[in-house]
Swiss-Prot record:
Cofactor binding notes: Binds 1 [3Fe-4S] cluster. Binds 1 [4Fe-4S] cluster.
Reported cofactor(s): [3Fe-4S] cluster; [4Fe-4S] cluster; Zn(2+)
UniProt modified residues of type N6-methyllysine: 29
UniProt binding sites for Zn(2+): 16, 19, 34
Molecular function as annotated in GO: 3 iron, 4 sulfur cluster binding; 4 iron, 4 sulfur cluster binding; metal ion binding
Domain 4Fe-4S ferredoxin-type: 35-54
Region annotation N-terminal extension: where it falls in the sequence: 1-36
Protein name: Zinc-containing ferredoxin A
Gene designation: zfx
Composition bias type Basic and acidic residues, residue spans: 9-20
Amino acid sequence: GIDPNYRTSRPEVGTHEGHKVYGPVENPKVLGIHGAIVGVDFDLCIADGSCINA
């Protein structure tokens, strides 16, 4: 799953559509974690919710 401490354990590498992006990022294959309040790891999840354990 996503590292709950990603905001401190990963470098902030930029922004996308107004939210922070945490690296590493190596487009097009490694996309990093997007968001600071709700983080989505685009390398683990495609943001459709299917990767979330509830």
